[in-house]
Amino acid sequence: VDDWEVVEFPAIIEDKEGNEASLWPEFWPLEELQAKKASLDVRYWNAQYLQNPVSEEGALIKREWWKIWEDEVPPSCEFTIMSLDAAQEANNRADYNSLTTWGVFFNEETNNYNIILLNSIKQRLEFPELKELCIQEYKDWEPDAFIVEKKSNGAALYQEVRRMGIPVGEFTPGKGQDKISRVNAVSDLFRSGIVWAPDHRWAHEVIEECNDFPSGANDDLVDATTLALMRFRQGGFIRLPSDEEDDMVYGIPGRGKKLYAI
């Protein structure tokens, strides 16, 4: 294998600023490729058009561990968390910002609390645009908690959003924890079959990026996911059979149902 040089030709290429272009515009215009991307399963698009197939053997969060919520209306959630993984630099459009919204609900079929992905946004935005997005999403979802890791661009956003009256919280998953340690800290939730996602393309992008980690090209959605799920776990909203028994009772009075993001 070492004697071979791997040559990849992704259908869509990006420059350092994050601008997209077709590799062969005379044959595949960018607009047609984007339409093709929207019509294909994420894993097939990554493998066939981006030349980036990923084996599931090394996945820390396997796609098969996710549960798919097929109802168009999500369950009534007792507590919701919005989590943001901000780009490293405030004015760098080459980096992604990932904003996810999650809810915890009681599953009557399994008689325990489960987690569901309610919304996910992954975009390249400069700081003013990111701030506007966070404010609008907070108004739309009215989460019980909005958490940002105070590093790089997230620290500036944390201060700015708080000044505007949004009760954003600082959350550090663990001093010195690397990305793999964070994923390992929540992988049991997926393996136990208590994490759900709706059958929408944006949700499948989260599933595929988690499956591709740590060998995938991007991990922004992975960071936002682990941030929220570690908060659920550390806050005591979700318990597994392996957790130690205690006398604490968790839960917040039910909230009304809300449609998924489209």
Task: Indicate residue ranges for each PLM-predicted region.
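Catalytic phosphate/metal-binding cores of nucleic-acid and nucleotide-processing enzymes, i.e., regions
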Residues: P74, F79, G103-F106, A155
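ATPase catalytic-site recognition across NTP-hydrolyzing enzymes
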Residues: K16-A87
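Generic detector of well-ordered alpha-helical packing
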Residues: A86, K150, D220-L221
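Helicase-core coupling region on the C-terminal RecA-like lobe
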Residues: Q48, P53-E56, L221, P241, ...
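Acidic two-metal-ion nuclease catalytic site recognized across multiple nuclease folds
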Residues: A228-I262
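An active-site-proximal beta-strand-loop segment
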Residues: L84-N97
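Charged alpha-helix within mobile-element recombinases
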Residues: E209-R233
